[in-house]
């Protein structure tokens, strides 16, 4: 009766999360280009409402854009249906 050494089993268990082909040359992430990295200063959105430009012809409507009570009614009607056995 031959038994495998315990160290071999531990080595196999330690390598479970390594993806296939991870040890091949060139398998790492490619270097990032400077032109692809976003600059923080460019993408800063305006923080107050005065800085935002309104869309011409747009009207400010009262209330939310979606009827919330309708969504809540539909959500309350939903119920869990178990899978039918075949």
From Swiss-Prot:
**Which species is listed as the source?**
Pongo abelii (Sumatran orangutan)
InterPro entries the record matches: Chisel
Q: Where is this region: Disordered?
A: 20-64
Q: Which PANTHER family match?
A: SMALL MUSCULAR PROTEIN
Q: Which Pfam families match?
A: Chisel
| Tree of life domain | Eukaryota
The protein, known as: Small muscular protein
Per the record, GO CC terms? costamere; M band; muscle tendon junction
Q: What is the lineage of its organism?
A: Eukaryota, Metazoa, Chordata, Craniata, Vertebrata
Q: Which gene encodes it?
A: SMPX
State what this protein does: Plays a role in the regulatory network through which muscle cells coordinate their structural and functional states during growth, adaptation, and repair.
Task: State the family it belongs to.
Answer: Belongs to the SMPX family.
């Amino acid at each position: 009766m031959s038994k495998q050494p315990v160290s071999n089993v531990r080595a196999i268990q330690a390598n479970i999360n390594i993806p296939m082909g991870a040890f091949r040359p060139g398998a790492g992430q490619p270097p990032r280009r400077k032109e692809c990295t976003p600059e923080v200063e460019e993408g800063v959105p305006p923080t107050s409402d005065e800085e935002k430009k309104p869309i011409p012809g747009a009207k400010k409507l009262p209330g939310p854009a979606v009827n919330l009570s309708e969504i809540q009614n539909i959500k309350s009607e939903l119920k869990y249906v178990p899978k039918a056995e075949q």
